[in-house]
Design a protein with these regions (language model features):
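Residues on the lipid-exposed face of transmembrane beta-strands in outer-membrane beta-barrel proteins
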Residues: 25, 49-57, 69-71, 94-102, ...
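Flexible, solvent-exposed loop segments that connect beta-strands
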Residues: 30-43, 73-92, 120-144, 175-181
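Repeated loop/turn-to-beta-strand initiation elements of outer-membrane beta-barrel proteins
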Residues: 19, 61-65, 107-110, 156-164
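Short glycine/proline- and aromatic-enriched beta-strand/turn motifs that initiate or cap beta-hairpins
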Residues: 16-61, 65, 187, 193-196
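Short hydrophobic interaction/assembly module
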Residues: 62-78
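Sec-dependent N-terminal signal peptides
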Residues: 3-13
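Helix-adjacent hinge/juxtasegments
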Residues: 85-107
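Predominantly the C-terminal beta-signal and adjacent terminal strand-loop region
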Residues: 20, 32, 70, 74, ...
């Protein structure tokens, strides 16, 4: 699996445009639904770290494709029957984005992309009644998680090789069944881009 990811990340040199590194914050909402279709837990959004490493390819003069690795913390706090609880999870995976990039002049550009992401939990805990519960045994958390959404990005080219950018991304997961958990993260990030 690692070799496939490395091949995808390093291939297509003729189409290569830039490497991007970003850091930011996820504001994540959890949506639980039990077999009756109701949410028995009162949860609030909580922040978590977001890191990204990607490679952007020019598909044409207007459209770009972004393929990358992502590390995300999807966290939440709340209560169930007045018992406080907190979820802390770490996910790693792949992200793919495609969309138009518009040149605004003076080194500025704006891009809007449709985004798909697939990731797996590498660590997860639930804090409830003064103890931590490992979430690896919970299939709602420890399963392949696919998310879909969009992103908006403003780029400023500093010189021919180096640029900086600010990005907003919104994703939703869609799990179906008798009892489900869906993540809805909104991510604000900044980063640096290096042209080859």
């Amino acid at each position: 699996m690692k070799r496939i990811l490395l091949f995808l990340f390093l291939s297509f040199p003729a189409l290569s445009q830039s490497y991007k590194v970003s850091v930011g914050s996820n504001i994540t909402s959890y949506e639980f639904a039990n077999s009756a279709g109701t949410n028995p837990i009162s949860l609030r959004s909580e922040s978590g770290l977001a890191l990204g490493l990607s490679r952007e390819f020019s598909l044409s003069k207007v459209f770009v494709l972004d393929l990358g690795l992502a590390y995300n913390q999807f966290n939440s706090v709340g209560d169930i029957q007045n018992i406080p609880l907190a979820y802390s999870t770490d996910f790693m995976g792949l992200s793919l984005g495609v969309g138009p990039s518009l040149n605004l002049g003076k080194g500025l550009s704006f891009s809007a992309k449709a985004v798909a992401s697939a990731s797996s939990m590498v660590k997860g805990n639930q804090f409830i009644q003064n103890r931590y519960v490992d979430l690896f045994a919970d299939k709602q958390f420890n399963s392949l998680r696919t998310l879909y959404g969009y992103s908006f990005e403003i780029n400023k080219q500093i010189n021919e090789q180096v640029g900086v950018f600010a990005k907003y991304q919104h994703l939703d997961s869609y799990n179906f069944g008798s009892s489900t958990l869906n993540f809805i993260p909104s991510t604000f990030s900044i980063g640096i881009s290096l042209r080859k």
